[in-house]
Amino acid sequence: MSRTKKTRRITDIMPARKADKKPEQPKLSGGKNRKPTRYELDAKAREEKKKRKHKGLPTGSRNVDPAEQKKAAVKEVKDPRIGSRKKIPLMVEFVNKPEKGQIIKPVAVEEYKPHLSPELELEQLENNEILNQLLDEIEAGKTLSAKDQKFVDECLDRIDELMTELGIQDEDEDNGDALLRQFETMDINQFR
C-alpha cells in the first residue's frame, strides 16, 4: 500500500496559523471617492509586499487546483500538423481517383524492346519455331490467315534487312554464277 502524507486540517481545536489568518481590513466609511488614510495605505502595501515575496509556486502536484489545471489545458495551443486524425491512403489509385463522370485516359507506355546485336537478332529470327512452322505450311500449299501472313512478311523483311546490314548474301541466289565470278576475279599467284 502506498504511503499518504498527512495534511493539516484546520479544526476548532487547533490554533490558527499566520498564513491561515486573513488580515483584518479596517472598514471604510464614506463613498467611493474617499481618499484612503495613511494606515490603510501601509496595510495594503504590506499585503502586496508579502505577495511579491512569496510568488513561487507550492511544491508537488498535490497542490494544483483542478480548476486552474483545466484552464491551463484549454490555453495550450497545439500544432495542427502533429497528431492528425485524417486517414492517409497507402495506394496511389485512391488519391488520384477521378470525380464522377470524368475519365482519366491511360498513358500509352511504349514497350521496351531490348536492343540486340544484328547477328543475335538474325539468329533468333531464323530459329523462330512459329515462323518456321508457318513457312512449312506455305510450302505445303496451305493458305494462312491475314494475321499470320502479316507476321511472316514482317519477319522475312526484317531478315532481309539484317542480312544486307551484315553483308550476308542468300545462299540460294545463283550459286553457279557467284562461283564463276569468284574464280575469274581470284589471283592465282596467291596459292603458290
From Swiss-Prot:
NCBIfam families in the cross-refs: PRK05244.1-1
Region of interest (Disordered), ranges: 1-80
Keyword Acetylation belongs to the record: no
Composition-biased stretches (Basic and acidic residues): 9-25, 37-48, 65-80
Record family assignment: Belongs to the YihI family.
Keyword Metal-binding found: no
Domain of life: Bacteria
Protein name per the record: Der GTPase-activating protein YihI
Function, as annotated: A GTPase-activating protein (GAP) that modifies Der/EngA GTPase function. May play a role in ribosome biogenesis.
GO molecular function: GTPase activator activity
Subunit structure: Interacts with Der.
Keywords carried by this UniProt record: GTPase activation, Ribosome biogenesis
Single GO BP term: ribosome biogenesis
Native species: Actinobacillus pleuropneumoniae serotype 7 (strain AP76)
